Regions:
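Hydrophobic/basic alpha-helical segments
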Residues: 1-133
Length: 133
């Protein structure tokens, strides 16, 4: 029964794969992302063994690619933190208060730190402040 296996995959495997993804997702190398996608590809092959194409299996099971799911999860997490002034991590997000026009207000909503290294730029808050600007 593919519905039961799909539910098992989402509840057990996907939840383990995506655990604490805001802490590590943006620091993954392309090789690591490929490995995660390979895990999902194998799982969908178990759920739908007679389907040849990975994209068709994802469509049939209503699953996004794992990297898309993780990126969406991180984006939603950042938005939830940024929109809630009472969130304990909200103070880590720097809002740009020196906005001069409506156009610049949209472009420069967040003020990311000046980072010297790519690793620092790809941390959760720095990456998504740049992403949403």
């Amino acid at each position: 029964d593919s519905d039961g296996l799909r539910t098992f995959y989402i509840a057990n495997i996907k939840s383990i794969i995506s655990y604490a993804c805001p802490a590590w997702y943006n620091l993954l190398s392309d090789t690591d992302k490929t490995r995660l996608e390979r895990i999902q590809r194998s799982a969908t092959r178990i759920v739908l063994p007679f389907s040849d194409n990975y994209e068709q299996r994802l469509d049939h099971l209503a699953l996004p690619p794992i990297t898309t799911f993780l990126h969406t999860t991180c984006s939603e997490n950042f938005t939830r933190i940024a929109d809630n002034d009472n969130h304990p991590l909200n103070s880590r997000i720097k809002i740009n208060t020196n906005r001069t026009s409506a156009r610049r207000a949209k472009i420069d909503k967040y003020r990311p730190s000046k980072c010297r290294t790519t690793k620092r730029q790809n941390t959760f808050f720095e990456f998504y402040m740049r992403f949403f600007n």
